[in-house]
Amino acid sequence: METKGYHSLPEGLDMERRWSQVSQTLERSSLGPAERTTENNYMEIVNVSCVSGAIPNNSTQGSSKEKHELLPYIQQDNSRSGILPSDIKTELESKELSATVAESMGLYMDSVRDAEYTYDQQNQQGSLSPTKIYQNMEQLVKFYKENGHRSSTLSAMSRPLRSFMPDSAASMNGGALRAIVKSPIICHEKSSSVSSPLNMASSVCSPVGINSMSSSTTSFGSFPVHSPITQGTSLTCSPSVENRGSRSHSPTHASNVGSPLSSPLSSMKSPISSPPSHCSVKSPVSSPNNVPLRSSVSSPANLNNSRCSVSSPSNNTNNRSTLSSPTASTVGSIGSPISNAFSYATSGASAGAGAIQDVVPSPDTHEKGAHDVPFPKTEEVEKAISNGVTGPLNIVQYIKSEPDGAFSSSCLGGNSKISPSSPFSVPIKQESSKHSCSGASFKGNPTVNPFPFMDGSYFSFMDDKDYYSLSGILGPPVPGFDGSCEDSAFPVGIKQEPDDGSYYPEASIPSSAIVGVNSGGQSFHYRIGAQGTISLSRSPRDQSFQHLSSFPPVNTLVESWKPHGDLSSRRSDGYPVLEYIPENVSSSTLRSVSTGSSRPSKICLVCGDEASGCHYGVVTCGSCKVFFKRAVEGQHNYLCAGRNDCIIDKIRRKNCPACRLQKCLQAGMNLGARKSKKLGKLKGLHEEQPQQPPPPPPQSPEEGTTYIAPTKEPSVNSALVPQLTSITHALTPSPAMILENIEPETVYAGYDNSKPDTAESLLSTLNRLAAKQMIQVVKWAKVLPGFKNLPLEDQITLIQYSWMCLSSFALSWRSYKHTNSQLLYFAPDLVFNEEKMHQSAMYELCQGMRQISLQFVRLQLTFEEYSIMKVLLLLSTVPKDGLKSQAAFEEMRTNYIKELRKMVTKCPNSSGQSWQRFYQLTKLLDSMHDLVSDLLEFCFYTFRESQALKVEFPAMLVEIITDQLPKVESGNAKPLYFHRK
């Protein structure tokens, strides 16, 4: 029967029920640009052959049996070029034929839709493919036979699907055209390659007429498979192809053509429709080899790099195309039921880098309010592309959100789960905590700091009392000091650890250390810095002497402290010193008397390297020794390229010779200096003299006398009493000698010269330096003769009241020795000139400390005088109510005043002027109280406003100031003056 196509045909899916829900689709065609008007809508002539018995009658089982009998076919004839208007039949005949076909389709759909209507579920899984899969299914649709027309239109209804309209096709055809071809079938099973011979009538495109084609996408279950035009590119014919009167749409004549694929919800009313769940139409689609096509699936070399969704059957023999002609392409990429079931479709040479679905909604989709089609989950499979090259499309990967079972079990273990709120859809591999230091952090447990000394706080194995308070540092009180040999003032020898770089002049060194003594008599020395050391002292020994009630033996103090670098000319470096000699010692014991433990290694006071000895009056390394000698003897005039404050250390000591020479001079190096050997007189004590006459030679038997054994050797008590008396007098150390040996080492401030000098940074550096110096002061007071006789509470009180006085007095001494009182020598790496004094916000106080240093220059103060005066300053401030053991304190202070008087009298240049010098020295001690009062006032102010001023206070100073501040402000502190004001 021959009929004419009509504008709008109802859908074949239960026409009466769905008529109001289906949108109208208009297809327009034209023969040429001049003939196109709004009324010039010609319908194509199609020849339909109704096969009898193709439609079963309400029998689901019968349809299953007849599925193998009916096969669709569509043939295309290229012999004619167009359709004449005289061949158009009446519209009434077309409507009658359409009604007959629709009624037949409706009868079948009523019988099978309840049993096999699963379209919605399969559509959400992405089961859409225009492929040849239903060879065993029943032919349910009438096909148009070849009737000599040039072109025909096949439009099979499928589930609403997203249209693919790439920009390249729009720009090529002059606009965003709507495709006139819809993917003809909906797949629920495995699909195979769609093929069509060249002689078949194509329902998809004609050789010259069709310029744009949309595509659909399918997937087998959860496995994505590309349809003939999966990649989202339109079937585009060359614009230069001549339009030979085809009724197909061209870009210039069909701008308003409604597309079945332009919107997912638009339904083309086609005279032929396939049921959603049973695709019984073979859709052989072919593109003739004479049309230059653009393919996003296969792009062989002879296709002029054009895009096409359908491979040319004659020129695509070696490409794996999504749609292939059976005569040319033997390898179809759309998986057939046999070869490619449950597998990924193989992309062509330009199909992209993986099995990716590019779902791009068309503009029509949003205009018509379509619901989004769920994106199928895809994942990129390694080696899924045989010879793939990334295509020109912007491929979007939708990563699978659910973690794979094998992956999660291998990475996270059996009990690992992914939190639904986790920002990562793919689980992150977590190492087991058995051999991992971070395992505890994953479980929520706090991790232990492997480097506790970097914390900046005080660390100790003792309780808080031991390492935060002065009582812990000073240790428990000892028995009374009565001068006997059995009771010593020093029950515990303080061991100074080898200098391992804690005093290294680096800015990065933390600022504190701690020394403590626990109840067991062990002293702990912690340096909180780049190097952390813990030292345990030796066990207590009996260290006493006979004839001096206030001072311990020399060797004890020599072992307890390292020699001071600046005072090494007055030390007994390298010379043995004898301890006291007990009464029951034998002569052989004297031979074995040594100096005790060997001295620890020293550091160079210039560069911080390991010192090789005392060179030119200063403990330095060999490199600095040679440098200083050559610089002074050669009279070099070095100039600093910076600000004369370069860092001189082991690595950078050769960078700036000017700053290195300046540091050598500040350390006290002098070519004329020679090492003093004050204790050299003790050297001869090691050479033992014959203490007993040799025994008489035995008489020979010839003389007739009987050999008599020698009498018992006299006891030590009787034989060595006279010699021990003289030795003891020779070994009696003077207080000045003891104070010299216990003088603390030089402490570095750790000042960073690279940062700009501000009041906050300078004051914070001074506070950190003061905390370090307080450790040295406590160690010094601990071994001070007579100080351990005082109760522990009195010791703490005296240190709290006098710490500022001791620090400023020591600063004046260093400034006097190193800069001749021209600068304030706080530390080797922190020297204040006039500029820094102004920047520190304490210029007047700095000038006051400098005036004290200038008094040292005027008086030419000696170290012996300085050391005794410093002890008197420790004992110069007491509570207003007195100490707990005031009598012991008064006795100790009186002894040191007498020692100062003796020292002044022994001075060789003070004949006749000793009393005057003693007066001047005591007046200098009185002047320290006025200076310290101003310093404490400034210190307390910065302590209260430390948060606002951004000034740091170490824990040691915080403890001392917290206890001292209320006592001083309440007037409980009482300074002791030598002279009335």
From Swiss-Prot:
Residues reported to bind Zn(2+) 2: 640, 646, 656, 659
Zinc finger region(s), NR C4-type: 604-624, 640-664
Disulphide linkage map: none
GO terms, biological process: angiotensin-activated signaling pathway; cellular response to aldosterone; intracellular sodium ion homeostasis; locomotory behavior; nuclear receptor-mediated corticosteroid signaling pathway; nuclear receptor-mediated steroid hormone signaling pathway; positive regulation of non-canonical NF-kappaB signal transduction; positive regulation of transcription by RNA polymerase II
Residues with PTM Phosphoserine: 250, 259, 283, 287, 299
Residues reported to bind progesterone: 767, 773, 814, 942
Keyword set, alphabetical order: Cytoplasm, DNA-binding, Endoplasmic reticulum, Lipid-binding, Membrane, Metal-binding, Nucleus, Phosphoprotein, Receptor, Steroid-binding, Transcription, Transcription regulation, Zinc, Zinc-finger
Binding site for aldosterone: 767, 773, 814, 942
Tissue localization of expression: Detected in liver, brain, heart, kidney, colon, aorta, hippocampus, hypothalamus and adrenal fasciculata.
Record field: compositional bias (Polar residues): 234-258
Subcellular location: Cytoplasm; Nucleus; Endoplasmic reticulum membrane
GO CC, any one term: endoplasmic reticulum membrane
Positions of region (Hinge): 670-722
Bilayer topology term: Peripheral membrane protein
Region (Modulating) location: 1-603
Listed Low complexity bias regions: 259-300, 309-327
Keyword Endoplasmic reticulum among record annotations: yes
Region annotation (Important for coactivator binding) ranges: 779-782
Superkingdom of this protein's organism: Eukaryota
Binding site for 21-hydroxyprogesterone: 767, 773, 814, 942
Record's compositionally biased regions (Pro residues): 691-700
Keyword Zinc among UniProt keywords: yes
Oligomer and partners: Heteromultimeric cytoplasmic complex with HSP90, HSP70, and FKBP4, in the absence of ligand. After ligand binding, it translocates to the nucleus and binds to DNA as a homodimer and as a heterodimer with NR3C1. Binds the coactivator NCOA2. May interact with HSD11B2 in the absence of ligand. Binds the coactivators NCOA1, TIF1 and NRIP1.
Protein family (similarity comment): Belongs to the nuclear hormone receptor family. NR3 subfamily.
Name by which UniProt lists this protein: Mineralocorticoid receptor
Gene name of this polypeptide: Nr3c2
